[in-house]
Amino acid sequence: MSTLLYLHGFNSSPRSAKASLLKNWLAEHHPDVEMIIPQLPPYPSDAAELLESIVLEHGGDSLGIVGSSLGGYYATWLSQCFMLPAVVVNPAVRPFELLTDYLGQNENPYTGQQYVLESRHIYDLKVMQIDPLEAPDLIWLLQQTGDEVLDYRQAVAYYASCRQTVIEGGNHAFTGFEDYFNPIVDFLGLHHL
């Protein structure tokens, strides 16, 4: 069994546009690939615990990861800890710096979940950073320079030793994501020969 684990971004949900596009495409073109899109908890330590449990549950499977934005940060951590292939899409490289702007009360607009982000949660996020990458060959960076949320240059520098596709223009949502579905499945090794 092949499994694709999709990790959404900050304050997002499994109903994100990219996740839905990929899920529908897989159902049509690779029905043998199971796609898991967990609702990630707002707190990093809870998210890490959930992701570890998913990986351990699928220990015998061929498992690949796709992560977007904050999900790309988690995907990088998971990839390097468990030696799994990952595609990171406009990933957050230093989210522990960005999320200080969100300290205090927050609400996920997709789920309506309210939560309080505290400095200890930022610390939990920081300890998940892997620098330098231990197995850069396991990661493919998909990056658009027109990302209006994150500085694309951070990702290009951090993932310098990884496979990279850097596209001029675009946006944080990653325009034309569907053009990369076949290469993503190939890179993650999820197709059956």
Swiss-Prot record:
Gene3D superfamilies: alpha/beta hydrolase (3.40.50.1820). GO terms for molecular function: carboxylic ester hydrolase activity; hydrolase activity, acting on ester bonds. Its EC number is 3.1.-.-. It is an enzyme of class 3 (hydrolase). This is Esterase YqiA. It comes from the Bacteria. GO terms for cellular component: cytosol. Keywords: Hydrolase, Serine esterase. Displays esterase activity toward palmitoyl-CoA and pNP-butyrate. Pfam families: UPF0227 (PF05728).
